[in-house]
C-alpha cells in the first residue's frame, strides 16, 4: 500500500506517475473528497475531545464548591455521545481511504525503464553459453515420459489438466533440486530455513498484496463472498508462493534494527488457478496449478533495500551457475512489474527445445508497500519512533522449471540425462538417469 501522505501532499504528481508508469487511473476526485471529509472529522473529533476535557475539569471545580453539577454532567454526557459519533464517522472514512489505497499499485523506482509489457524489459547480463547439440533436441515432456518419470495422464486422472505425477529417478531429481537449493541458501547465503503453513487466512493475503486484487488467482476453501464467520468455517486459501506466509512472519511486529536484515527461506508447494492464462504453456511443467518453489525473503532497513535486491538476486543466480544452466538477467519495465513491486529482476533460463530463455526466478524489492499493509516496523535502540521496514522476495528457484532446464540442457542422444555434479550427492551418486 502506498503512503497516504503522498496523496495528501502530492496527489496530482502521484496520479500522473501511476497513469504514465503503471497504466493505473487514480480516482483523484474521490481521494480529494475523502481527504476533505477526513480532515473535517479529525478537526471535529479533536475539538470535541478538548471541549469535553475542559468541561470535565469544570465539573470537578464546581463539585468542590458545592454547586449543583447535574446540568454540567448532562452536557458532558451529550458531548461524549457526539464525540463517539464523530469517531465512528472518522473510522468509517479512514476505512474507505484504506479500501481505495488497497487497489493502488506501488510506484516504480526511478531507474525502472518505462514500458508497456515484457517486450520492453531491459536485459542486464547473460551467463553461460547455450549448449550446441549434435542431435535433435527433445523437450522435457518427451524426455520425461520416455524415462517413465513424468506422467501427465495420471495428473489429469487424479485431478485435472496442469497437474502431473512424477515417478522414480525424476521424482528423486526433483527432490534433489529443492534440497540443494535449501542447503545453498542456508549454509552459504545466511538464510534461516522455515517450514510454514500452506493454508493461510485472509489477513495474511492482504498483508502481501494478493487480496483484494488477485483473489481469482487463488484456490480458496470457501468462496470469497458469503463466508460463514464461525470459527469452524473460517475461510483459508492455498498459498500461491511461500512469500505470503514467510513475509507475514513480521506482520504487526516491531523489530530491533540491530537484528536486521532478516533472511528466511522456505520450500513449499505453490497453488495458482492461472486465471487469464488459458491456452498459454499448455504442454509440460512450465505453467502448473501446483508446483514447488524455494523462496527467499529478506526484511531490511529502508536504506539497505536496493543493495539487498542485488544480493538476493545474486543468490538466485548462484543456483543457476552451480547447476551450469545458461541464463540472462532482465530488469522488468513498468508495464511488466508485479502489483506491489518497486523494482524487479527476472532470471530467465535457456531452454534448448524452445530455443529461448524462460523465466525461472523473479526477485523484487517491495519497498515499504507490504510493510505498510502488515504494520511491520523497526526501531533503533534509543529511538522513540518506529519506521516501516522494507521487504524483498525472490525465487531461489522454481523447482519444476529448474527440472525442465536440467532435463533439456543435460539430455543425451540416447534420451538419458546426465546429472549435474552438484546434485549427485543428493542422488546417491547417480551420474546418468536412464529408462
Curated annotation (Swiss-Prot):
GO terms for cellular component: cytoplasm. Keywords: Aminoacyl-tRNA synthetase, ATP-binding, Cytoplasm, Ligase, Nucleotide-binding, Protein biosynthesis. It catalyses: tRNA(Ser) + L-serine + ATP = L-seryl-tRNA(Ser) + AMP + diphosphate + H(+); tRNA(Sec) + L-serine + ATP = L-seryl-tRNA(Sec) + AMP + diphosphate + H(+). ATP binds at residues 272-274, 359-362. L-serine binds at residues 241-243, 295, 395. The keyword Thylakoid does not apply. Pathway: Aminoacyl-tRNA biosynthesis; selenocysteinyl-tRNA(Sec) biosynthesis; L-seryl-tRNA(Sec) from L-serine and tRNA(Sec): step 1/1. One of its GO terms (molecular function) is ATP binding. Its EC number is 6.1.1.11. It is found in: Cytoplasm. Gene3D superfamilies: Bira Bifunctional Protein, Domain 2, Serine-tRNA synthetase, tRNA binding domain. GO terms for biological process: selenocysteine biosynthetic process; seryl-tRNA aminoacylation. NCBIfam families: serS (TIGR00414). Belongs to the class-II aminoacyl-tRNA synthetase family. Type-1 seryl-tRNA synthetase subfamily. Consists of two distinct domains, a catalytic core and a N-terminal extension that is involved in tRNA binding. Homodimer. The tRNA molecule binds across the dimer. Catalyzes the attachment of serine to tRNA(Ser). Is also able to aminoacylate tRNA(Sec) with serine, to form the misacylated tRNA L-seryl-tRNA(Sec), which will be further converted into selenocysteinyl-tRNA(Sec). This is Serine--tRNA ligase.
Amino acid at each position: 500500500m502506498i503512503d497516504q501522505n503522498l496523496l495528501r501532499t502530492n496527489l496530482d504528481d502521484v496520479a500522473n506517475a501511476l497513469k504514465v508508469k503503471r497504466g493505473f487511473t487514480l480516482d483523484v476526485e474521490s481521494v480529494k473528497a475523502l481527504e476533505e471529509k477526513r480532515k473535517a472529522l479529525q478537526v471535529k473529533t479533536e475539538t470535541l475531545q478538548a471541549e469535553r476535557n475542559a468541561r470535565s475539569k469544570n465539573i470537578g471545580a464546581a463539585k468542590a464548591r458545592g454547586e449543583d453539577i447535574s446540568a454540567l454532567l448532562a452536557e458532558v454526557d451529550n458531548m461524549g455521545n457526539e464525540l463517539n459519533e464523530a469517531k465512528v464517522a472518522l473510522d468509517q472514512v479512514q476505512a474507505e481511504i484504506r479500501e481505495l489505497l488497497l487497489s493502488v499499485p506501488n510506484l516504480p523506482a526511478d531507474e525502472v525503464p518505462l514500458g508497456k509489457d515484457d517486450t520492453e524489459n531491459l536485459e542486464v547480463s547473460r551467463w553461460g553459453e547455450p549448449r550446441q547439440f549434435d542431435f535433435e533436441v527433445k523437450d522435457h515432456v518427451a524426455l520425461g515420459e520416455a524415462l517413465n518419470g513424468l506422467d501427465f495422464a495420471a495428473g489429469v486422472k487424479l485431478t485435472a489438466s496442469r497437474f502431473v505425477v512424477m515417478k522414480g529417478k525424476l521424482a528423486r531429481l526433483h527432490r534433489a533440486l529443492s534440497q540443494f537449493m535449501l542447503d545453498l541458501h542456508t549454509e552459504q547465503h545466511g538464510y534461516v530455513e522455515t517450514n510454514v503453513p500452506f493454508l493461510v487466512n485472509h489477513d495474511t493475503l492482504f498483508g502481501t498484496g494478493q487480496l483484494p486484487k488477485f483473489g481469482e488467482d487463488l484456490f480458496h476453501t470457501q468462496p470469497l463472498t458469503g463466508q460463514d464467520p464461525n470459527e469452524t468455517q473460517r475461510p483459508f486459501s492455498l498459498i500461491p508462493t511461500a512469500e505470503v506466509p514467510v513475509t507475514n512472519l513480521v506482520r504487526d511486529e516491531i523489530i530491533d534494527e540491530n537484528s536486521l536484515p532478516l533472511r528466511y527461506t522456505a520450500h513449499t508447494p505453490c497453488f495458482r488457478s492461472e486465471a487469464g492464462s488459458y491456452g498459454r504453456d499448455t504442454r509440460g511443467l512450465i505453467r502448473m496449478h501446483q508446483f514447488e518453489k524455494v523462496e527467499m525473503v529478506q526484511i531490511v532497513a529502508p536504506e539497505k533495500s536496493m543493495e539487498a535486491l542485488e544480493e538476493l538476486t545474486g543468490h538466485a543466480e548462484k543456483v543457476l551457475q552451480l547447476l551450469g544452466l545458461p541464463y540472462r538477467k532482465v530488469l522488468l519495465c513498468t508495464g511488466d512489474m508485479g502489483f506491489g513491486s518497486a523494482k524487479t529482476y527476472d532470471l530467465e533460463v535457456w531452454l534448448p527445445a524452445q530455443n529461448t530463455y524462460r523465466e525461472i526466478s523473479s526477485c523484487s524489492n517491495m519497498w515499504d508497500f507490504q510493510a505498510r499493509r502488515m504494520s511491520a516496523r523497526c526501531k533503533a535502540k534509543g529511538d522513540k519512533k518506529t519506521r516501516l521496514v522494507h521487504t524483498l522476495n525472490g525465487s531461489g528457484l522454481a523447482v519444476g522449471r529448474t527440472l525442465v532446464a536440467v532435463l533439456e540442457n543435460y539430455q543425451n542422444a540416447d534420451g538419458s540425462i546426465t546429472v549435474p555434479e552438484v546434485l549427485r550427492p543428493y542422488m546417491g551418486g547417480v551420474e546418468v538417469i536412464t529408462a
